Amino acid sequence: MSDLFSFNKEKKNKLVDNNYSAKDIEVLEGLEPVRKRPGMYIGGTDSNAMHHLVSEVLDNAMDEAVAGFASIITIKMHQDHSITIFDNGRGIPIDNHPKFPDKSALEVILTTLHSGGKFSNNVYHTAGGLHGVGISVVNALSKHLEIKVYKQGKLYSQSYSKGEKLTDLICEEASKRLRGTSINFTPDPEIFSEKLHFNPKKIYELARSKAYLYRGVTIEWECEVEVPSDIPKKALINFPNGLKDYLSSKITLDNLIIPEIFSGNIESTPDEIKLEWAICWQNNDNSAFIQSYCNTVPTPQGGTHEQGLKSAILRGLKAYGEMIGNKKAANLTIEDILETASVVLSIFIAEPSFQGQTKEKLVSNGVSKPVENIIKDHFDHFLSSDKALATNLLEHVIAIAEFRISKKNEKNISRKNATQKLRLPGKLADCTRTTPGGTELFIVEGDSAGGSAKQARNRETQAVLPLWGKVLNVASSTLEKIVNNQAIQDLEIALACGSLKNYKEENLRYEKIIIMTDADVDGAHIASLLMTFFFLRMPKLVEEGHLYLAKPPLYRLTQSNKTYYAGDEEEKAKLTDKLSKASKAKIEVGRFKGLGEMMPAQLKETTMHPEKRSLLKVTLEDFQNVDKIVDDLMGKKPEKRFQFIYEQALVKMDKIINELDI
């Protein structure tokens, strides 16, 4: 106890000695905060964050279209990996700003956070861009940005780099028929990795999503870099029937429970809401998804508009069941109804409120009830217009509900009860915590790695499951093989959440599932087999964000009795160069043959300690096509695998050619 007080005293004295004065307060001006903390504005510095820059520029163009001022948007990906987005709208204002008389409005918008025309309803009734943050953030995080504005027979242009102005506003003569705004930019490799480039498929799908969200716009697509076989080099993208067209393109029509897509489109309401939706029910629950948008901005975390739709569908089916005397309908939940449903929802409202800068969840009050009333009214008409169709749908969702209810008694209410009921694998070193929150399961290969991991773990929160024998490739195996495989049996028993349609997140015994394999090629192969298992047998576990990859080191570098670790050859080279410049002392390099060769203390320090390790979260951008993607790469047909590798090689070769100094 005395040690505790002496420690606090020492700590207090250190704080007193450390003068905390005005000079310690940082004041970041202009776009400095964006470059210093990009994650606060775009959610990180990874590939998803970099593509968010494209979304911001495209959202601004879409705002012009939705407001009725633009009909064509052009997206062009260039050989140098820059991108140009043009809209034929009114063009950003170029006259001097009244608050900054020495600057054009264009320069103010590009260099000042929280500037723009979306703070009132005078310019845009509905808007999707980040209200004066989006384009200035793009400018701040771009190595180069050039903007062109066509207005009244003039072309106004200006160049920027990393948020700083390179040129004054230049005015030239141009055709009077041209109008609008063109923005070309290249993400800054100092912020994003030099290895990162725009993904043509991702941007093409983004363009498609914007086009179906607003029927009045045509998007011209052009890509100069190599594209996958399913992505065109050039295309005109337009969906005259909006969301219904889009949903039809995403599903297999002969796989529908009922042959009709329930869709609707309301242009305006007394609540000043524009609403569109499309819903269908399929035989395969792996095809289920919900995609929602507000003012063309994706809201992957849902929000009040989704709540309204869910309430409408649930109330509608329960009311129909009551009307025809089917008492089982009273037991329905929204999860039963949506288990095999594919849903697309779009809403346009004035002054939307989002959760966070990246706007992933709509939190606007006063949205849920109007959406519920509109969709409920249309759904009632949809069901009553075709009795056979409505009865088929009702019986389908009731069957799902009955299956859920039949399993209710088998559910493990707490993790403690689950542990008591399950005969856990003998090789599992379980953690002592009895609730899933904060717990982790490390999946390792063999006893050697398992032994080190068991000694390195935190026994309260970290469990270790060594897998014996060859990990099965479930993509090319029969159901009988999968069911009888010992490693898969052990894994499914340890997780306790079930698989495929029997998967239940509430039964999952751990918050994080971490695949921890050797840092070499063999380890990567085992990790790919395990990920294949999760993608095909437990895709919702991945979708819900429970699956991770550990990043153990491959090399150990020692200099002057100090130890450093590197994950791969490139990291080793950079670290060696850094250490050589800092000191002339000899650097000793050792290569780990595997996790089992590492001392428990090393494994804990580099790979397992939550505050010191680095984890990769496993995500999928296209859950609807996961079966096809995994089958192409991991399935029985080598020609599909060859095509996948060939397409990736083309992308890689394109990068290499563009980097050659010729």
Curated annotation (Swiss-Prot):
A GO BP annotation: DNA topological change
EC number(s) per entry: 5.6.2.2
Cofactor or coenzyme needed: Mg(2+); Mn(2+); Ca(2+)
The keyword Nucleotide-binding is annotated on this UniProt entry: yes
GO cellular component: chromosome
Cofactor binding annotation: Binds two Mg(2+) per subunit. The magnesium ions form salt bridges with both the protein and the DNA. Can also accept other divalent metal cations, such as Mn(2+) or Ca(2+).
Top-level taxon: Bacteria
Keywords for the protein's UniProt record, in alphabetical order: ATP-binding, DNA-binding, Isomerase, Magnesium, Metal-binding, Nucleotide-binding, Topoisomerase
Catalysed reactions, as listed in the record: ATP-dependent breakage, passage and rejoining of double-stranded DNA
SMART domains: HATPase_c, TOP2c
Molecular function terms, GO-annotated: ATP binding; DNA binding; DNA topoisomerase type II (double strand cut, ATP-hydrolyzing) activity; metal ion binding
UniProt-annotated binding residues for Mg(2+) 1: E445, D518
Gene3D superfamilies found in the cross-reference section: 3.30.230.10, 3.40.50.670, Histidine kinase-like ATPase, C-terminal domain
Site (Interaction with DNA): K470, N473, H525, R641
Binding, Mg(2+) 2: D518, D520
Domain Toprim: 439-553
Positions annotated to bind ATP: Y20, N60, D87, G129, L130, H131, G132, V133, G134, I135, K359
Function summary: Topoisomerase IV is essential for chromosome segregation. It relaxes supercoiled DNA. Performs the decatenation events required during the replication of a circular DNA molecule.
Subunit structure: Heterotetramer composed of ParC and ParE.
The protein, known as: DNA topoisomerase 4 subunit B
Protein source organism: Rickettsia felis (strain ATCC VR-1525 / URRWXCal2) (Rickettsia azadi)
